[in-house]
Amino acid sequence: MAYCNSKTDLSRVPLLALNMGFRKKVGLYLNPRNAVAADWMALAEALGFTFLEIKNYESAINPTVKVLEDWQARSTDATVGKLLSILSEVERNDVLEDLQPMIDEDVRRYCERLNRDPEPPVQVNQVDSCFHRTLERVGLTLHDDPEGTPELFDAFICYCQRDFEFVQEMIRQLEETDFKLKLCVFDRDVLPGSCVWTITSELIEKRCKRMVVVISDEYLDSEACDFQTKFALSLSPGARNKRLIPVKYKSMSKPFPSILRFLTLCDYTRPCTQAWFWKRLAKALSLP
């Protein structure tokens, strides 16, 4: 989409164009249980969520926001146009009428960003072979050649500092064995001095084939991990290319992140499957 105007096809505008302000506002309309008008449960059902999934959303602080977030992550057709169509189907035209100015403004801003940066994220199941060599993206990692091909990796490891001991074990098991995989570990491989968000998005999108997410209670409190996970999911909606692999290595007291529930988990906490854990993970990371 080169530009946007009043005739913009909203079925081609991804849901991520709608900012948090709009999503919270929709929640004010849909979160209250309503015996007459359709609420967030009706929206979730229309979006394709199962009964058990909808029951789990009842514990969310803002279930409407959570439903939209998960729909965006799991569906290939999560667009502004689709959302508006479903709100119309469940007869919540009041929401459409009241929030139309916010929708128009969010779409306008999204299109302006596209005009400034005409290269949207490449949603493919392999590392992008076309590198935009700006100064900000040269010499990011320890073994980068500023004059040659950037350093590439089999997987980006998403983790918080409290889980670094397990990341070190992952390095030993996957890099220093016959698997000979190449992992991108931020604290080890990334050079200091550049914008964290720019480096992270560059590495996940263009340098790494996949991303391993180390899930723990501490992970749930990490803003960096939250950004990395959602960015990786946006590159692979619906997990159609197995780009993101969640790993659980210790028991958790908090609920497993709902945004990752639809992905197959590599679970190190189950004694009966630990013998196969590293082989399964290595195989998943070795796929084309």
From Swiss-Prot:
Annotated region (Intermediate domain), positions in chain: 104-148
GO CC annotation: cytoplasm; plasma membrane
Domain named Death: residues: 25-103
Any single Pfam family the record assigns to this protein: TIR_2
Matches recorded under InterPro entries: DEATH-like_dom_sf, Death_dom, MyD88_Death, Myelin_different_resp_MyD88, TIR_dom, Toll_tir_struct_dom_sf
Record CDD domains: Death_MyD88 (cd08312)
Positions of the TIR domain: 151-285
Keywords per UniProt: Cytoplasm, Immunity, Inflammatory response, Innate immunity
Alphabetized GO MF terms: TIR domain binding; Toll-like receptor binding
Main location: cytoplasm
One GO term (biological process): innate immune response
UniProt note: domains: The intermediate domain (ID) is required for the phosphorylation and activation of IRAK.
Annotated protein name in UniProt: Myeloid differentiation primary response protein MyD88
Lineage, opening ranks: Eukaryota, Metazoa, Chordata, Craniata, Vertebrata
